[in-house]
């Protein structure tokens, strides 16, 4: 017989997702993923079971994603067991690119930050989300080349052996280990930027 006293409506999911991607908020990613799982299967309560439900939906809705390599232990990716291949992520981008979102029927790039190229004269526009850990760097989204050609892309740079060594190193928070890891990240970012600028100029 209880009656509600007050209710608070959240912002539209599209707006929440924009902030999530802008600030890389892992808690928001977990909560959105769990809410999605509960919508698909009421009663889901844990992050692991929620990730399994969403992965099952992906397998049915976008079979290429799971077929090409999508193993998620949770919804944020902050787990050593999580593995996603470039091909699987590209399949997800293609699915997103074929749809429109929100009341304004916007393309999926409305979710992503527009990034400028570091060098002058590269041309083009970049809408992408990056992910960074020591010995792992990725970026995915859409590149609009200087010629006006839209390209979906996924770039991943990973050193699995160095990452495993870093995780198993008791001194990983000490300066020498951190310095080496940061050097690797700088090289990965430079390579990533060079590839994207080359595509922007030549394709």
What are these regions (language model features)?
Residues 68-203:
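C-terminal soluble interaction/assembly domains
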